[in-house]
From Swiss-Prot:
Transmembrane segments: none annotated. It comes from Pseudomonas putida (strain ATCC 700007 / DSM 6899 / JCM 31910 / BCRC 17059 / LMG 24140 / F1). This is Co-chaperone protein HscB homolog. GO terms for biological process: [2Fe-2S] cluster assembly; protein complex oligomerization; protein folding. Co-chaperone involved in the maturation of iron-sulfur cluster-containing proteins. Seems to help targeting proteins to be folded toward HscA. The lineage of its organism: Bacteria, Pseudomonadati, Pseudomonadota, Gammaproteobacteria, Pseudomonadales. One of its GO terms (molecular function) is ATPase activator activity. Pfam families: DnaJ, HSCB_C. The gene is hscB. Interacts with HscA and stimulates its ATPase activity.
Length: 173
């Protein structure tokens, strides 16, 4: 038995554009149904199945609620499997990455919490733009190579956003 499509678990059609609030609501509903505690008095087999369903549901939810992970998953289920680590051949984006990293390093050295907040807003705007670009590209036939490039950019920005949140927490303490 294979793992069901993440979208099918939530009764959704594969799409990049999702209503994340509805996804979260549906996740909570389904999680209650398959929660292993509900099967505490069931047979060992039923408990194992409940645990597997719960794990699959959690994995599907984590994938679909994250834009970069959702983009990678869409590419994979469409037959465009993307290796995890690939050198990015995009000089403009590489330059932008270096500039963002230098700026973040300066903000850290200066312990500039307000500056980190401004940086975080700019990063969020860049993420929103990339998400829209990917969604438009995904909806256009024959754009899978561009979709892959955009997904890689999304992954980088997601990682950078995590680093920004960590810096913000350190500076806020």
């Amino acid at each position: 038995m294979g793992t069901p499509c993440h979208y099918a678990l939530f009764d959704l059609q594969p799409s990049f554009r999702l209503d994340l609030d509805k996804l979260a609501t549906r996740y909570r509903e389904l999680a209650r149904e398959v929660h292993p505690d509900r099967f505490a008095d069931a047979s060992e087999r039923e408990q194992r199945v409940a645990l597997e369903k719960s794990a699959a549901l959690n994995d599907a939810y984590q994938t679909l609620r994250s834009a970069p992970r959702r983009a990678r998953y869409l590419l994979a289920i469409s037959g465009h499997e993307v290796p995890q680590e690939v050198t990015v051949h995009d000089p403009d984006f590489l330059l932008q990455q270096m500039q963002w990293r230098e700026e973040l390093e300066e903000l850290q050295d200066e312990a500039d919490l307000d500056g980190v907040g401004v940086f975080k807003k700019r990063l969020k705007a860049a993420q929103d733009t990339l998400n829209e670009d990917f969604a438009g590209c995904w909806d256009a036939p024959g754009e899978r190579d561009k979709a892959e490039r955009l997904m890689r950019r999304m992954q980088f920005l997601d990682k950078l956003a995590q680093e920004v949140r960590q810096l913000e927490e350190r500076l806020d303490d």
